């Protein structure tokens, strides 16, 4: 409260004050304390729930369970705060992909945050998950498999007044964004457009996105960009015909976070 008072005194025209907040930090407050923070000007919380799966939360050593995620989100909303929940696609690997989609959607359907901010996972080699990748207990998903996970996740989200957004460069389909109540089907249609591409075009778009040649699916229709992406793909294949594109794309994603 002292920090908020100082902000208000020095910036009297401030309209939004935002803070990052762990789920277990929120639940350590009681409802009256959260409302006092809101009345003092803290009106937007960014919370990195990552997933609604207890199994995955334990795997990544997050430090709290799915019940804490749900309780914290509901507490923030009850305090009349704007709530952004950050989730990670691919954080369970191939083994827990469906679990991640289903349980994360289940939690968010209860919370009904104002924003659902979607990030594709980039696993750093020195991390614990990187160790799991090396020992074979965690299997990296291809970009297409992460998109399929996103489709499963989006399908299971209710049509609520939450804004769904792929806003970070690590995401493959940046145009998948919109209000879940009014634009959910449009977002699913964009995902289906990608999944319906011929195999070679899906790979080309994936490589082009990771090299920042393409940004939107429609960029595939631009001859100069298509040619540039094709040239780069052939260079990759000429140097390593057996390249593991799941590992290569993960390497690029983890370098961007």
Enumerate the language-model features and the residues they cover.
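Auxiliary Fe-S-binding modules of radical SAM enzymes
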Residues: 109, 115, 123-257
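Alpha-helix N-cap and loop-to-helix initiation/capping positions
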Residues: 2, 60-68, 96-103, 137-145, ...
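Conserved SAM/AdoMet-binding glycine-rich loop
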Residues: 1-78
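Short, well-ordered secondary-structure micro-motifs
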Residues: 29-30, 58, 95-96, 128-130, ...
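A structural motif corresponding to the C-terminal end of an alpha-helix
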Residues: 10-12, 40, 75-83, 111, ...
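Catalytic cores of alpha/beta
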Residues: 29-34, 92-110, 150
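Conserved, mostly hydrophobic/aromatic
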Residues: 19, 47, 85, 108, ...
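Conserved strand-turn element in the central/C-terminal portion of the radical SAM core barrel
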Residues: 24, 48, 52-56, 75-100, ...
């Amino acid at each position: 409260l002292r920090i908020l008072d100082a902000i208000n005194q020095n910036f009297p025209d401030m309209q939004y004050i935002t803070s990052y907040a762990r789920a277990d930090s929120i639940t350590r407050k009681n409802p009256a304390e959260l409302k006092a923070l809101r009345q003092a000007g803290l009106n937007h919380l960014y919370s990195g729930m990552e997933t609604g799966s207890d199994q995955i939360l334990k795997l990544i050593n997050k430090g709290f369970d799915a019940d804490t995620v749900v309780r914290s989100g509901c507490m923030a909303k009850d305090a009349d705060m704007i709530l952004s929940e950050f989730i990670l696609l691919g954080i369970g690997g191939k083994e827990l992909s469906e679990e991640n989609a289903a349980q994360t959607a289940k939690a968010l359907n209860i919370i009904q945050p104002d924003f659902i901010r979607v990030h594709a996972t980039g696993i750093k080699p020195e991390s614990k998950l990187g160790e799991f990748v090396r020992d074979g207990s965690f299997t990296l998903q291809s970009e297409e498999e992460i998109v399929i996970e996103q489709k499963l996740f989006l399908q299971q989200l209710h049509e609520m007044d939450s804004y769904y957004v792929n806003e970070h460069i690590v995401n493959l389909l940046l145009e998948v964004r919109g209000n879940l109540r009014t634009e959910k089907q449009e977002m699913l249609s964009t995902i289906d457009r990608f999944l319906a591409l011929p195999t070679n075009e899906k790979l080309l778009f994936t490589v082009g996105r990771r090299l920042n040649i393409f940004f939107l699916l429609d960029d595939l229709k631009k001859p100069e960009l298509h040619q540039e992406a094709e040239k780069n793909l052939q260079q990759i294949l000429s140097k390593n015909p057996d390249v593991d594109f799941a590992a290569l794309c993960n390497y690029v994603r983890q370098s961007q976070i």
